[in-house]
Amino acid sequence: MQIWEAKWVKSLFNEYALFFISLCVLFWWLGTGSLTWKRISIPLFIGGYYLWKAEVYRFIRRIPLAALLPIAAALYTMFTPGYLFADIRNGYEILSVYLIGIMAILLLQDRYFISMLFLPIALSVTYIGFMVGIFSKPLVSCDERLVLFLKHPNILGAVSAIALLFLITYCNKWKGISRYILSGMGCLITLILILSANRAAYLATFVSLSFLIFYLSKKRIVPIVITVIICIVTIFVLPQEQLDRVVSSVESPLNDRTFETRKPIWEAAIAGIESAPWFGNSIRAFKAFHHNYIMENAEDLNSRYREVEKTVYHPHNIFIGLLFMYGIVGTTLFIWSVGLALKKALAQKDLFFQVVIIFYSVFGLFEFSLDREDGIVLLFFPMGLVYGREIAASLQRQPPAQHDQPCGAQAE
């Protein structure tokens, strides 16, 4: 018996509305900087209730073993062998978001993307509220950089960049007048990204958009024109101080002040990797480890670097950060999970997950976001979608169906 012919499936798709609403709210919370582990639990429990009520556990033996890899990575994070249970909250969020992604496919099928629209909607609404004077400037800006309600401009830069990539990747879903409305929203999100003055997000978005546009566009002049337009807009809308930062990073990246401050941070993280190479230290331990390291080596560090930051919460590099957090064992498990998901995304023609990986691979050269809800949701929810299709296909005894063909791509 194929699972979609089973009785529980017929009731399932008549009862998904509450899960859909909770998923919309989750992305709204993400866009307004108010997402917490407790709020992540809401769609998890609602979706879990629907699946349990439908007796989906009867088919658990059909689930591909590969889909269990991210769960193993989440449990490893929760357990944190190098520093017992230090990252239990991060691990819980990874597990929850991944399972929510799977549930989105099983419960909503190809309608899950509508809930993701609430991320760019939330960003747009809060920015418009700032522009019309509902929110004061000190509330949503920091050092002439836009923050909105996301606590730091670097967080806003990453979130707005992924929101923009989502709108572009799924643009074939928008029909009629909604296509024009969402195109306007995309322009607004681009402006928000520019005003965040997050140079790492700029670079990662440029690389990701280049991949997207060259993949989708037959006219190679298009990406050149778009790049020129964005550069011109950036020059006119960025405050002079932030524009100088961007120009400095282009003209002399190795002498840039921010790059200089990253060096002692990376040095401390590498020392942490050497102290616990196999099982890691946990990301929660980094602040204390970094502080102790710079205190113990203050004279040497001050002689070699122009500036040494006293308080740092993460390693500012995802590759170094993973080894510090997980060690060799956990990093291998993490990369295995992501790599296999990427392979399956290529087979499914899921362009969004591919772009997310490209973005975080570049963004991660200078930032580490897996210690925050935004980084966890924007990586592990799309991963859950990829494995969710594998699970759905396994339950149907059919090859994976592509539910989110990117704009301009043709179904085979």
Enumerate the language-model features and the residues they cover.
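A membrane-periplasm/extracellular boundary helix in multi-pass inner-membrane enzymes
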Residues: L216-L254, E267-S275, I283
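Loop-to-helix entry and N-terminal half of a specific, functionally important transmembrane alpha helix
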Residues: A17-C24, Y313, K343-F366, I376, ...
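Transmembrane signal-anchor hairpin modules in multi-pass inner-membrane enzymes, especially those
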Residues: M1-F79, F85-A86, L99, L106-Y112, ...
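Hydrophobic transmembrane alpha-helices and their immediate junctions
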Residues: A54-V56, I181, F214, R220-V225, ...
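Membrane-interface catalytic loops of GT-C/OST-like multi-pass glycosylation enzymes that act
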Residues: L35, F85-R89, E144, L148-P153, ...
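Long extracytoplasmic/lumenal interhelical loops at the membrane interface
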Residues: N255-E267, S275, F279-Y326
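Hydrophobic core segments of transmembrane alpha-helices in multi-pass, intramembrane catalytic enzymes
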Residues: K38-Y49, R89-I102, I128, N154-Y170, ...
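Alpha-helical transmembrane segments of multi-pass inner-membrane proteins
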Residues: Y112-C142, L148-L216, T227, V237, ...
